[in-house]
Amino acid sequence: CRGAIHKFRCVPHLTGRCFEHGVTDCYTLFRDAYHLAGIEMPDFHRGDDWWRNGQNLYLDNMEATGFYRVALTEAQPGDVLLCCFGASVPNHAAIYCGDGGLLHHIPEQLSKRERYTDKWQRRTHSLWRHRAWHASAFTGICNDLAAASTFV
């Protein structure tokens, strides 16, 4: 971690989490996955239905938190997919896992790995990569997934 000692906080397994907006939601999963990769993301208040109230929290914060946009054709494991889930602005984040898979958490479901099917490709708004990302950073995420998850 750039020559510094990185202290990891305890996070629950990335899969199998119950959904509670603003507490254990898709952003929490994204934040915790990146923590396991050694990249800290801020926690911020997310009011219910923020995307219906004129806010655009993901697009307003991606660049400020170290992300830059990349072409969907250049997707690499660990990249963040922003999706429009019943909204006109991106209101859902998923981690691209490679080999056609993603990790995400949607309302009324447990967090899970899922195939990046046409359904999700149609909902995808954009793909983002963190400036500090490197391929080995995905190891912490992979280790957690191997310990606790299955494909749906």
Where are these regions (language model features)?
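Active-site nucleophilic cysteine motif
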Residues: 18-37
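Flexible glycine-rich active-site/ligand-binding loops centered on an Asp-His dyad
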Residues: 118-123
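Long, low-complexity intrinsically disordered regions
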Residues: 11-14, 29-32, 128-152
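Extracytoplasmic copper-binding redox domains, predominantly the cupredoxin/blue-copper superfamily
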Residues: 40
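...with weaker cross-activation on analogous glycine-rich loops/strands in unrelated enzymes
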Residues: 8, 46-111, 117, 151
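Short, structured interface segments
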Residues: 1-10
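Short, well-ordered, mixed-charge alpha-helical segments that flank or form enzyme active sites
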Residues: 2, 111-113, 136
